[in-house]
Amino acid sequence: MKETNSFSQKLKQFVLLFFPIFVTQMSLFAMSFFDTTMSGHASPIDLAGVAIGTSIWIPVSTGLTGILMATTPIVAQLVGSKKKEDVPHVIIQAVYLAICASFVVILIGLFTVTPILNGMRLEEPVERIAAQFLSIIAIGIIPLFTYTVLRGFIDALGKTRTTMIITLLSLPINVVLNYVLIFGNFGFPKLGGVGAAIASAATYWCILIITVMIIRTKEPFASFNIFKQLYRPSLSSWKEFLKLGVPIGFAIFFETSIFAAVTLMMSNFSTTTIAAHQAAMNFASLLYMTPLSLAMAMTIAVGFEVGAKRYNNAKQYGFIGIGLALAFALLYSILLYFFDDEIASIYTTDIQVHHLAKEFLIFAILFQISDAIATPVQGALRGYKDVNVALIMTLIAYWVIGLPLGYILATYTDWAAKGYWIGLIIGLAFGATFLLIRLFQVQRKYTTQNSRS
């Protein structure tokens, strides 16, 4: 990141920041994408089992990685304010937190996964695959969480191309392992959805190893000497980190868990409905990588400018990110409307699943506009380190409005499973509106402070 003087320079720098993040997020999502699509071609039961396992794993992993994402705005502001010497201590303390969080998640999972799955009244093969999926994916928790911290450091320096290269190097490993283990090729046993979990866990370890090697040997990362000194754990540092990270993590958890909750509540419907819902939701999540990547770029750009006390520049980056998100939303809506048949065919050859997935995809169109506003706005707010209000707004939008309304529509109207999608759409729209209002308030506050000073 560097200081810019014109809107065109900001737009160019933002795009150069965003594009590698986008490729990275798409590559990381591709692991889940290939898990789902390749499991679906193994059998509808494997697809449903992976869907249930993923619906439990994703909210937990994204919520906790969200806490660790506090690394990015903290480091970005330190770099913007010329306090490079403080960065190694922040990163090492965050790594300690990541490892501790990993063991806590694994311990909790040992006692909760089986009761949760038993209470869902799933078909026995689906429950078995989901349980095995979750048991095996736990092997990848430590490297995933640790990598999240190190990636936050790399991205905060504006070197998003590096994380892109790391992920692109790792993706082929995941695809090959999926091909070998899901379908039983090259003499390996045919494991179905369970093979997808093994592939993902192994890939997480590969990503961490590559990242550590780059930080130790390549500039500008090596000049920070991140691993030169293993600082003693500092509870005060953990407290400061968590003060920012916990609201970020819970906001992400509330958003991702609402979709997982819908998938779990759909366990009362048929395996066909679960599989179709998962296929449509998986593709909608694929499109979500764009506003998510824009949000991550906004956190870096806004955080850097706020650290340097250039508040008008931070405001302009906010407008750039939201404008690009809305443009992509229009493009994706057209894609979903005209190519729903082709999209559904990616996930399944089962006629019933294919037909129902097409119906769900139409609702995904309505997700696009709300996501294009809410997600980048949250990224900008994180750059300002303004996270508490966003947490409350997200909780209300998704869990007080979206899910209860979806349940009512699914249970007491003819919309059935589609009622959940309608509830989510209304909740997302509410959240987007109020998050945008909050961003305007924060921008006005900082701009006013700048004028007075």
Curated annotation (Swiss-Prot):
GO terms for cellular component: plasma membrane. The gene is norM. One of its GO terms (molecular function) is antiporter activity. It comes from Bacillus anthracis. Its main location: membrane. It is found in: Cell membrane. Disulfide bonds: none annotated. One of its GO terms (biological process) is monoatomic ion transport. The chain crosses the membrane at residues 13-34, 49-71, 92-114, 129-151, 164-183, 193-215, 244-266, 286-308, 317-339, 359-381, 388-410, 420-442. This is Probable multidrug resistance protein NorM. It is a multi-pass membrane protein. The keyword tRNA processing does not apply. Keywords: Antiport, Cell membrane, Ion transport, Membrane, Transmembrane, Transmembrane helix, Transport. The keyword Transport applies. CDD domains: MATE_NorM_like (cd13131). Belongs to the multi antimicrobial extrusion (MATE) (TC 2.A.66.1) family. Multidrug efflux pump.
